[in-house]
């Protein structure tokens, strides 16, 4: 019975880690990445549309992103969406292709990015701890209902804490790696 509680907690914590990793993909490291534009949507015939659904996005060089719209009439809309996105990118176009040169991060921008990573790390840990709380409440209610003995409930809570500690360490490791990428020159 407790195995189900552990398994559910692990699955939810895995999802929290996946959400953190997805969020960290959008944090700039000074190199071009397709995921940088994931959250950017353009107004495509009245519908908010991700850029990669209206154009071919490529990375020909480590510090350059090219965007070739399938419909040349939306080139200005794509540019506008990128400028509004608060990514600090300046697109330029030649009428057919948008080019985005990724500038090296300034020291101040690097510090901002590290702060953002730390904030995301804390949010990830909070998610994991909330899942721990839910699992512990499930165990307590099982004990209260008489489904498990008191000593088993304490062992269950210890196991949930071990699982939580493992996932908090994963969050720390993932964010430390991202921080290292940001601070690399």
Swiss-Prot record:
CDD domains assigned to the protein according to its UniProt record, in alphabetical order: RRF
Transmembrane portions of the chain: none
* Gene Ontology MF, one: ribosomal large subunit binding
Among Gene3D superfamilies, the record links this protein to:
3.30.1360.40, Ribosome-recycling factor (1.10.132.20)
Under the heading InterPro entries, the entry gives:
Ribosome_recyc_fac, Ribosome_recyc_fac_dom, RRF_sf
Q: What GO cellular component entries does it have?
A: cytoplasm
* A Pfam family hit: RRF
Single GO biological process annotation from the record: translational termination
- The principal localisation class reads cytoplasm
The places in or outside the cell where this protein is found are: Cytoplasm
Instruction: Give the keywords, sorted.
Output: Cytoplasm, Protein biosynthesis
**Is Transmembrane helix among the key words of this record?**
no
* Role this protein plays: Responsible for the release of ribosomes from messenger RNA at the termination of protein biosynthesis. May increase the efficiency of translation by recycling ribosomes from one round of translation to another.
Q: What is stated as this protein's family in its record?
A: Belongs to the RRF family.
Return the HAMAP family for the record: RRF
Recorded protein name is Ribosome-recycling factor
Question: What is the species of this protein?
Answer: Desulfatibacillum aliphaticivorans
């Amino acid at each position: 019975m407790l195995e189900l509680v552990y398994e559910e907690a692990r699955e939810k914590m895995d999802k929290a880690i996946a959400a953190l990793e997805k969020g960290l993909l959008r944090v700039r490291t000074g190199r071009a990445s397709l995921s940088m534009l994931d959250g950017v949507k353009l107004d495509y015939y009245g519908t908010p549309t991700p850029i990669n659904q209206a154009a071919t996005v490529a990375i020909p060089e480590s510090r350059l992103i090219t965007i070739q719209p399938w419909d040349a009439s939306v080139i200005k809309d794509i540019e506008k969406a990128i400028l509004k996105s608060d990514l600090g990118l300046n697109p330029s176009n030649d009428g057919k292709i948008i080019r985005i040169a990724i500038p090296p991060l300034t020291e101040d921008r690097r510090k901002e990015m590290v702060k953002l990573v730390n904030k995301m790390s804390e949010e990830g840990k909070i998610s994991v701890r909330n899942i721990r709380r839910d699992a512990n409440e499930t165990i307590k209610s099982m004990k209260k209902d008489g489904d498990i003995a008191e000593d088993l409930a304490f062992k269950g809570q210890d196991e949930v804490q071990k699982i939580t500690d493992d996932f908090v360490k994963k969050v720390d490791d993932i964010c430390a790696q991202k921080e290292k990428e940001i601070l690399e020159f």
